[in-house]
Structure formats: structure tokens, C-alpha cells
Amino acid sequence: MSNRPSTARPNSASPRRPNTPGRPSSARPGSGRTRASPRGGSAGGKRFSKEPQHNAEEGYVRIYLRGRPVTNYLPSDVEDYDLNAKHPAPTEKLKLDWVYGYRGRDCRCNLYLLPTGEIIYFMAAVVVLYNVEEQNQRHYTGHNDDVKSIAVHPDSVTIATGQVAGHDPDEGKPHVRIWNSITMETLHVLGLGFFDRAVCALSFSKVNVGVHLAAVDESNEHVLSVWDWKKEKKLSDTKSSQDPVLACEYHPMNDEQIITLGKGHIHFWNTTGGKLVKKSGIFEKYDKPKFVLSLAFTGNGDVITGDSNGNMYIWGKGNTRISQAILGAHEGGIFSLCVMNDGQILSGGGKDKKVILWTADYQQSEVTQVTEATGPVRTLCKGKGEDFYVGTTRNAILSGNMGGEFNTLVQAHTEELWGLALHPTQGLFLTCGYDKNVIMWDFEQHKPMWNKLMEDGCQSAGFHPSGAVVAIGMTSGRWVALDVESQDLITVHTDGKEQHDIIRYSPDGNFLAVASHDNYIYIYSVTEEGRKYSKVGKCSGHSSFVTHIDWSADSTKLQSNSGDYELLFWDAATCKQIVISKETRDVEWATFTGVLGYPVCGIWPEGSDGTDVNTTARSANGNLLASGDDFGKINLFRYPVNHPKADCTSFKGHSSHVTSVAFNGDSTKLISTGGRDMSCMQWSVV
């Protein structure tokens, strides 16, 4: 089961969805904010199905979200509007170009080097094959939710990946997908209806050319199962442990032995006769660790383990007793072990962040260390020659060797991600998250240009039209403006005590609107190219938190959406509400990022509860609208989406709620961010 929020805006609460039981609310601790109850709502939380209405005399279309009416006035030049007209999907598609990030925070044993020169790992619902030398990525997108485990077949081509319970009606239960890493073709799907919550560990057998696959799920008993994967047949299964299981590996010299380890245990399983028979490792005179964290196999078949006490134990081949101990090998846990091609052993520490090279007879040879910024070692993977790769707990991948500094190949946010802004004139975009990190990325190089750590978690971002200044909205009620080139603070302001969901400059750069979770929109006058700010006032009228804002092309008006499905309009200079909505029907909006209004009234699928769609973006050429939903999908519409239940084309990759989408200036690329999946994805419009 994926530990994710119901995918409303943070600090809001909404009914749980029937296909994803047990997902916690996305409200932040301490927040009293909830999405307002709809008028006429039922205590049972049933979805409403009132049909859309068109009033030709008044010139509006009315849709209903959880029973609440949302009135959308048609532009005055729209004639002969047909409510039931078909709205076809666009001919354009999205092609996934790049996935920013790696899931190291809470997964392990998930980084391998393939003979193609690609490193393989996963982020969100995508398995990434990254060729570092050629600087390109390929992607396996067969999963519909978080990938949690991976195994590479002895043929180095066939891959097994396991996922959590997901959204798909047919393949939404936890399962394993077997696929070809050359063609990206799915070969087999295992365990639909068998696994519980998630598949957390996988291993192919070695000696018999990988005929069998072992898997462990995240049920209360952490069931271990063995499969003939080509026949999609389960051969045996047993309850493994009531405590967490962190790894599962076939012995490379004995296909009748599987080793599992985790909290307080290491188990040696014998598969002879089609049954799984367990023998527990005996620690005897040595301290039993709280966690056995990692294992590797030597050339002679011995098993090496690393534990939470920082000790390395050697278990003789075919034995369940410790034959040798290296006590205090690390200060703190040993998160990963890796046997190099020459028989030497790498160990990676958590607390001490050290990578230590040991000789084949377990003498310490060399020591190096990863930085605080990239985080402790999560997993180690041997590369070519003396080189190796390091996956870290801060979602980074490094490359290097014992003799030099590490090169950061992959970087990502480490907590929930909402903030996204595209540079107005350059091929750059900026993301900011609850991890307090603000990162400027390069579209072409796919790497950070700079990274700045803030004092508070970050919620939103927006560039000044000059591109020289960027405003960041915080989760604390503060907002700041940064110099893009130097990253120096230009100004710091506090408005209220709640997060600022949206922050956006007017097209002429003379105003800044800060939309807050306290129901207000704060307006500032901006001068000196974004370097001086004077408060104009605040827009007061919403009865729930503000979720989206857009400026008019002439920088005089604002439109805003709220958590209780209000669509309001404002005069920017006076902060007064424009109460006669018909007066805004012909306003040209510089951007369209809201989820309410005539141009987007068709984005809501049948049975929507009003929180299903989190974000939209109109392309710069005005031909397309992208939306991001609760189910990890990006939906591409023909703009304007002015007919209810419009057709769209959907694209998957994210596993959590899609929190932001944005097109670049020439409408050829789109950037999307995931909430709890912490990922950022770059797409081409084709």
C-alpha cells in the first residue's frame, strides 16, 4: 500500500477513494484547514452526479462538483453553443524525455549497471535506464504506481520490478512485472491478487539460469514466495517474518537457498522438495543487531552481512553460524555491501557516510566519504574497473572510485514537491519542496544549475517577467524574492501564518499576487525590476483556501479558485472583488492554470469529487491544456476544454498526485511534478 495522501491540496481533507483504502489525509500536522463541505452533501460521502446545464439566455454553462454548482460564463463571441457536442482529444502526445530523481529515501537494492552501459533504477512509477556517457534515458512505464523493488536476471536483459497497490482497475493490486530491457516489452505479470500492500524485495535464481523468482511482500507476515516466472506459476510460499524484511537474495552458487534479512533476523531458506524450510542465523556470542541491513556474497560462497551496530559478519557457505566478525566496521548502520570484480569488498555507512574498501581477507584498505548534501549511502553498485555507483538516502546517485571525488549524476527533492516555475526567457525551470530546497534545472543538460537551502519548507514559485528575480512561497506564511544569478535574498515578507499555495507576478511585472491557505490573496506593487515591493492590500472574499490564480493579459485583473470550488475575480489595483462575473467573460488571461472556468469546464471526469484535478496549464500557443490529477496521470486536452466530459489522452509516470504542470515558452516541452513521489518529469510534445 502506498503511504500517500488523498491527493487534495495539502492541508485539505477529502473523502477516501474507494479503490485506494487506507491512504492518509494530506493535511499537515497542526493544520485546522479542511475542504468545505458542499451544499446538499450527504453524510455518507457519496459522489454527486448532477448533469451540466447550459443557459443560453444568460450565456453560461453550469457544472457541479460534489453537488455544488460552478457557473462558467461563455465569452460573448461564442454562438450556437452545444452542451453535448463532442470534444475530441488532441492529436499531440506527450513523450517522456527525462525523469529527475532516484528513490533512495526508503528503498534499497535498487541500483544496477547493465551491459549496455546504462544504470537502472526507479523513481515514482517509472523504471529509468540512464546512459551516463551518452546522456540519455530510456523508460519502462508499465507500472501504475510506486515501484518498490527490482531484480536483474542473470542474462542481464530481463528485469523484474515490483510495485505497490495502485490506481489501475485491472492491474491496481500489488504485482511483479517481468520485462525486456532492450525492447521495453512486458513479458509477464505475476501475483495480481496474491501480494499484499507492496512487493518490497525480488531476486532471480542464479545457477539454473534464472528460472525462478523469489519475492517478498509487505503484508503483516511478509510472505516469501517462489515463482516459475515464465509459466507465471507460484511454486511455493510461506510466512517470512512479522518484522520488516529489507532484502531477499538467491545464493549465487545454490538455487535451493534463499536468504532474507531485516529487523532482528537473517533467515536461510531451503527450497528442496517444493517447500520453503527456514533456518535462522545464530549470532551466538555476538550482539544480535536491531536490524540486519545488507548482504553480499564472496567468490567462495560465503555470505557477508552488515547491520545496524556497524558490524560485518561472515557466514560460511552452507552455514547458519558466524565464522568471522569485523566489529565496528562503521560508526552506525552498514546500509550496503558490494563485492567488486577483483574480490575486494565495499561497505557503505549510514551515520558515518563512509565508503570503505576491504581486501578479500577483510582488512581495511581505503576509506572515502559522501557529503552531507547528497546524504548517507543507501546502496552500492559496482561499475567498470574500480569505479562504482552510490545511491543515497537523499535520492541522489553518485559515481566515482576510492581515489577521487564523487560526481553527482542524479539529484532530487527528498520531501513533498509542489513548487514549479519555468524561466520566461531561458531553457531553465525551478522546483521547490517541503525539504526546503530550491533547485534551478537546465532543460537540455538535465542537471541543477544551482541549489539553495531555505529556512522553511517551500510551496510555490514564480518568476518575474525579466527572469532576473524569482519569488518563493513558503509553508510558514513567509515569502521571499531571490536574485536568480546570485541566489541572494532580495526581500523577505510574512503574510499570515499559513502556506502560500500560489505566487505569481503580473505579465507587466508591476504586481505580485500571493495566494494563501488563509483564504486571502495578498497584492504587492513591484518596482525596480522586481527588487522593491510595497503592499497594496489583500483580496478578501474566498471562504476556503486559495488554490489557483491567473493574471489578465493587461495585468489589471485576477481570477482565483478556492478549495470549496469558488471562481472569483478581482481588480488588482484596489483588491476589490468583481462581483458581476459576466463582466469578466471576455477577459484575456495571460495564463490559465486554474481548474474552474469556461475554458476548463470539461476537464472533470465522470464522478469527480472536486479534488481529483490538482493543476492545469495552457500551452503558450493556446492549442493545448494539460492537467495533473490524483491518480498520477497527466491528461492532455484540446484547448479550450469547453464541453463537459471532454476527451483527452492520458500519460502515466507519476505515482503520487501530480501537483504542478507547466509548458515551456514555445509549447514543445512540459514539466510535471509529483507530490509525495518527489519526482520531476520532462516531456516532449510530439
From Swiss-Prot:
Disulfide bonding pattern of the chain: none
GO biological process, one term: microtubule cytoskeleton organization
Chief place where the protein resides: cytoplasm
Entries under Pfam families matching the protein: Beta-prop_EML, Beta-prop_EML_2, HELP
Highest taxon of the lineage: Eukaryota
Ranges occupied by WD repeats: 142-189, 194-237, 240-279, 287-325, 329-368, 412-451, 495-534, 541-580, 608-647, 653-685
Keywords from the named record: Cytoplasm, Cytoskeleton, Microtubule, Repeat, WD repeat
GO molecular function: microtubule binding
GO CC terms in record: cytoplasm; microtubule
Places the protein is found: Cytoplasm, Cytoskeleton
Segments for region (Disordered): 1-53
Biased composition annotated in UniProt, kind: Polar residues: 1-14
Cited function: May modify the assembly dynamics of microtubules, such that microtubules are slightly longer, but more dynamic.
Family listed: Belongs to the WD repeat EMAP family.
PANTHER family hit by this protein: ECHINODERM MICROTUBULE-ASSOCIATED PROTEIN-LIKE 2, WD-40 REPEAT PROTEIN
Protein name: 77 kDa echinoderm microtubule-associated protein
UniProt lineage: Eukaryota, Metazoa, Echinodermata, Eleutherozoa, Echinozoa
